[in-house]
Amino acid sequence: MSNHSEILERPETPYDITYRVGVAENKNSKFRRTMEDVHTYVKNFASRLDWGYFAVFDGHAGIQASKWCGKHLHTIIEQNILADETRDVRDVLNDSFLAIDEEINTKLVGNSGCTAAVCVLRWELPDSVSDDSMDLAQHQRKLYTANVGDSRIVLFRNGNSIRLTYDHKASDTLEMQRVEQAGGLIMKSRVNGMLAVTRSLGDKFFDSLVVGSPFTTSVEITSEDKFLILACDGLWDVIDDQDACELIKDITEPNEAAKVLVRYALENGTTDNVTVMVVFL
């Protein structure tokens, strides 16, 4: 385990996990003195067989916020899911992001913040099937995602990349309008001339301008879905979604796939920390 990761496993079961996870990271010491990225994954998430939690956090103004999210966000999400298992997980993710945003702003000193890209993968019964059905063939895998900022999640489906997140940047027209309506200014594609992202966890000195409310999605995972890429902008600054997927589509090991993407980012001029998580589905 690196100093900047939280890799957690629930008790092993006699059943196989249907997904495989690989992670690679690099401080990029040519341009960065510190590593502010954090990643987390949890097998058998919420003590449920074959559920998964996957997340990357890209810190700024210090590592405090990203480290706090790496240690605590999955616990908040788990508690909220188990408190009411009938709730839409997208609502759970939204509430959990807002809760940890408040925690960071009240419990941590300074103005540290982070972007976040989070996935919850779980088995569900379709609405048309009784909740007490024991027929495993009737269960389906559902993926729920949430993000703030410009960390991104991409699904590779049937040869095509599908972006499951939204880049909350000050250069985005909708986000620019929201910030200005809240009383902020966009200068040189930055909030008040300082911060490039318009949504994050933490950043308490920006108050209502930079918010923790995430973009959320849900999608059924089928046999057409090959893998997920979760990565900070250190990767996406130098490669687009489809090219990233094409680069690793023939690789059979997720750790190797993640390493290939990190290596590509470093060789193609990224100036940021780089963290990549690849989940084979």
Swiss-Prot record:
Ranges in a coiled coil: none
Pfam family, one: PP2C
Cofactor note: Binds 2 magnesium or manganese ions per subunit. Manganese is about 20 times more efficient than magnesium. Also has activity with calcium.
Binding site for Mn(2+) 2: 58, 233, 272
Binding-site residues, Mn(2+) 1: 58-59
InterPro entries named among the record's database cross-references: PP2C, PP2C_BS, PPM-type-like_dom_sf, PPM-type_phosphatase-like_dom
CDD domains linked: PP2Cc
Cofactor(s) demanded: Mg(2+); Mn(2+)
Highest taxon, organism lineage: Eukaryota
Reaction it catalyzes: O-phospho-L-seryl-[protein] + H2O = L-seryl-[protein] + phosphate; O-phospho-L-threonyl-[protein] + H2O = L-threonyl-[protein] + phosphate
GO biological process per UniProt: fungal-type cell wall organization or biogenesis; mitochondrion inheritance; negative regulation of MAPK cascade; pheromone-dependent signal transduction involved in conjugation with cellular fusion; signal transduction; tRNA splicing, via endonucleolytic cleavage and ligation
GO MF assignments: MAP kinase serine/threonine phosphatase activity; metal ion binding; protein serine/threonine phosphatase activity
Domain PPM-type phosphatase, chain residue ranges per copy: 20-281
Keywords tagged on the record: Hydrolase, Magnesium, Manganese, Metal-binding, Peroxisome, Protein phosphatase, Stress response
E.C. no: 3.1.3.16
Subcellular location, record wording: Peroxisome
SMART domains, A to Z: PP2C_SIG (SM00331), PP2Cc (SM00332)
GO cellular component annotations of the record: cytoplasm; nucleus; peroxisome
Family: Belongs to the PP2C family.
Protein's job: Serine and threonine phosphatase. Involved in tRNA splicing and cell separation.
General remark: Present with 1520 molecules/cell in log phase SD medium.
Record's subunit section: Interacts with NBP2 and PBS2.
Name by which UniProt lists this protein: Protein phosphatase 2C homolog 1
Gene it is expressed from: PTC1
